[in-house]
């Protein structure tokens, strides 16, 4: 028995239901071992939560300096994070994943990209918070669309009737809009802000 085996078994159960539905007892049953065997490797359910999120996010690469503008590097990072989370929709990243080791690695990578792009510390923090909020919303929308059998299509019912949107196209357009908004309202030395001053 290894921690890696436990994590992979947990992900299998999560993909069949959700992280909230997986207990240490159900995990032990899946592995056909006593519950205490699991606790010898993983101290708690909270620790298991972080381990499975780490496993899911490990594949996401932070584009190094020299691989394009800050905008393109951030697009690559956001695409990678989205793809990783879509593979395991039951993880509920917004509730369980933001403090995991790999999530922190990606957060530090995003901040590094923003600093390389010329943002001052305070502006970089604001830009990161904006991008992070966007990603959490996108993940939830992806999960909702997939759970409704959308197959990559998001359907909204409203006063104007049904509106069908391709999830990948929506993601790209929305990400471009967020990045453009960051440049407009925060700006960098190479691209001074043209929007309103923060707080006014």
Task: Give the ranges of each region predicted by the language model.
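Amphipathic alpha-helical interaction segments
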Residues: 5, 47, 76, 105, ...
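Helix-turn-helix
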Residues: 5, 9-47, 51
């Amino acid at each position: 028995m290894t921690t890696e085996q436990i994590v992979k078994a947990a992900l299998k159960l999560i993909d069949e239901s959700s992280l909230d539905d997986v207990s240490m007892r159900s995990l032990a049953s899946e592995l056909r071992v006593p519950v205490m065997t699991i606790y010898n490797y993983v101290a708690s359910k909270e620790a298991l939560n972080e381990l499975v999120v780490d496993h899911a996010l490990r594949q996401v690469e932070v584009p190094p300096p020299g691989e394009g503008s800050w905008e393109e590097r951030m697009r690559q990072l956001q695409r990678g994070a989205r793809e990783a989370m879509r593979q395991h929709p039951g993880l509920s990243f917004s509730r369980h994943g933001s403090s995991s080791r790999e999530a922190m690695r990606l957060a530090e990578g995003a901040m590094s990209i923003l600093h390389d792009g010329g943002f001052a510390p305070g502006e970089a923090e604001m830009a990161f918070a904006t991008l992070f909020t966007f990603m959490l919303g996108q993940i939830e929308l992806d999960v909702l669309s997939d759970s409704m059998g959308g197959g990559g299509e998001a359907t909204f019912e409203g006063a104007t009737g049904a509106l069908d949107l391709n999830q990948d196209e929506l993601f790209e357009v929305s990400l471009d809009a967020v990045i453009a908004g960051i440049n407009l309202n925060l700006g960098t030395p190479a691209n001074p802000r043209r929007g309103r001053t923060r707080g006014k």
